[in-house]
């Protein structure tokens, strides 16, 4: 506990809240170019091959982003849109690739929850 004299000398420091997606730099999304597209395995209780991509953003950051949905068309040099949002069972993956924009196509044969996977309304 500081004395009154110590508080006069220097006021209390504000606690700054850390952002969960620093590479976006306060923007809702960022554009980037895929440098590597590969699969990784999740943390302990789960088992799968999760599709991820290394992306070089326009902000200069190189990040790992998750590719949601079943099947994708991404490869090296694909231009993608990246949003925030981590994947709980993949350590270090704090971003999602937005489906249905730029070089990323929407998920094929998707009927429900279409807006999250960039799919137009079926006729």
Swiss-Prot record:
Gene Ontology biological process terms, A to Z: translation
One GO CC term, this protein: chloroplast
Primary location class: plastid
Keyword Ribosomal protein: yes
MF annotations from Gene Ontology: rRNA binding; structural constituent of ribosome
Pfam families registered for this protein in UniProt: Ribosom_S12_S23 (PF00164)
InterPro entries in the cross-refs: NA-bd_OB-fold, Ribosomal_uS12, Ribosomal_uS12_bac
Subcellular location(s) of the protein: Plastid, Chloroplast
Superkingdom per UniProt: Eukaryota
Keyword Plastid: yes
Keywords in alphabetical order: Chloroplast, Plastid, Ribonucleoprotein, Ribosomal protein, RNA-binding, rRNA-binding
SUPFAM superfamilies, A to Z: Nucleic acid-binding proteins
Protein's job: With S4 and S5 plays an important role in translational accuracy. Located at the interface of the 30S and 50S subunits.
UniProt cross-references to HAMAP family, sorted A to Z: Ribosomal_uS12_B
Subunit structure: Part of the 30S ribosomal subunit.
PANTHER family per record: 30S RIBOSOMAL PROTEIN S12 FAMILY MEMBER
Family statement: Belongs to the universal ribosomal protein uS12 family.
Protein name as catalogued: Small ribosomal subunit protein uS12c
Gene from which the chain derives: rps12
């Amino acid at each position: 506990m500081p004395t009154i004299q110590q508080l006069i000398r220097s006021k209390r420091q504000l606690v700054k809240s850390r952002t969960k997606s620093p590479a976006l730099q306060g923007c809702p999304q960022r554009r980037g170019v895929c440098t590597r597209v590969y699969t990784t395995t999740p943390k302990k209780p789960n088992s799968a091959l999760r599709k991820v991509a290394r992306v070089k953003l326009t902000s200069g950051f190189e990040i790992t982003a998750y590719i949601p949905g079943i099947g994708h068309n991404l490869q090296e040099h694909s231009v993608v849109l990246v949003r925030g949002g981590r994947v709980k069972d993949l350590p270090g993956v704090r971003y999602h690739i937005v489906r249905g924009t730029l070089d990323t196509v929407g998920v094929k044969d998707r009927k429900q929850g279409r807006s999250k996977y960039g799919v137009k309304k079926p006729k």
